[in-house]
Curated annotation (Swiss-Prot):
The gene is bel1. Keywords: Activator, DNA-binding, Host nucleus, Transcription, Transcription regulation. Pfam families: Foamy_BEL (PF03274). Residues 211-222 have a biased composition (Basic residues). It comes from Simian foamy virus (isolate chimpanzee). This is Protein Bel-1.
Length: 300
């Protein structure tokens, strides 16, 4: 917000109810019947214009609050006071609402877009507020599909229902509108022009989704192991010694005989091609058949 623009005051004393009187805080010179005026601080930069509110009362700065805390340490701390929505400025309330509806990155993205953010109380549910985004070029209005609620227990803005993934997001609609925006505001002389399509009430829409929507079953992260197809799962075939292939055509013996004929090192080649002597000795299993040893290592 521009520092030269006027800002609505945070004119509330709900957090100071434990104090005796306001005249004790600001001094007897300001305890009159008129509006409360806090003494102005000396201006460091005389060129900077003063910031006045609509009531011509200067906004209370952090330093003024700090002085009051130092003078009255036994009272409640003003920095611990959390303002309610009606006590917030519009800019602060807008940012807190967007952070309640979206993440911080999405809220920053919305604030950078050429839309003005506003909200109004829902006629269906007085506790809910409908957030609207108005294009600054063509005055098109986009309603957020998720209402926002003020949680008085924790004093923060929250979503009406945990259904953001179902009802959708307004960010995608705003991006789509930016690409197709006509950049021309509707003419006031032709009120018979096209009107925006009526949207469903976001509160009723969220209630309908919550009532009729059935969530999908979540997938398990761990893969289920099929014990019947696993060779090391207690299957008796895995513990039996013998040839791994019953088809004699794929055994190395006939293949080597066709290539080398009768050779002196044919048995050694068969052993190496079937897994080697180490495999035969330790696992007691090869494609040549049952081992010729004592069988102590025939079973894992």
């Amino acid at each position: 917000m521009d520092s030269y623009q006027e800002e609505e005051p945070v004119a509330s004393t709900s957090g100071l109810q434990d104090l005796q009187t306001l005249s004790e805080l600001v001094g007897p010179e300001n305890a009159g019947e008129g509006d409360l005026v806090i003494a102005e601080e000396p201006e460091e930069n005389p060129r900077r214009p003063r910031r006045y509110t609509k009531r011509d009362v200067k906004c209370v700065s952090y330093h003024a609050y700090k002085e009051l805390e130092d003078k009255h340490p036994h009272h409640i701390k003003l920095q611990d006071w959390i303002p309610k929505p009606e006590e917030m400025s519009k800019s602060i309330c807008k940012r807190l609402i967007l952070c309640g509806l979206y993440s911080g990155e999405k809220a920053r993205e919305i604030l950078k877009k050429p839309f003005t953010v506003s909200w109004e109380q829902s006629e269906t549910n007085p506790d809910c507020f409908i957030v609207s985004y108005t294009c600054i070029f063509c005055d098109a209005v986009i309603h957020d599909p998720m209402p926002v609620v003020w949680d008085s227990e924790v004093e923060i803005w929250v979503k009406y229902k945990p259904l953001r993934g179902i009802v959708g997001s307004a960010v995608f609609i705003m991006e789509k509108h930016q690409k197709n925006c006509s950049l021309v505001k509707p003419s006031t002389s032709c009120p018979e022009g096209p009107k925006p399509r009526r949207r469903h009430d976001p509160v009723l829409r969220c209630d309908m989704f919550e009532k009729h929507h059935k969530p999908r079953p979540k997938r398990s992260r761990k893969r289920s192991i099929d014990h019947e197809s696993c060779a090391s799962s207690g299957d008796t075939v895995a513990n039996e010694s013998g040839p791994l292939c019953t088809n004699t055509f794929w055994t190395p013996g006939p293949v080597l005989q066709g290539l080398l004929g009768e050779s002196s090192n044919l048995p050694d080649l068969e052993v190496h091609m079937s897994g080697g002597p180490f495999w035969k000795e330790v696992y007691g299993d090869s494609i040549l058949g049952p081992p010729s040893g004592s069988g102590e290592h025939s079973v894992l």
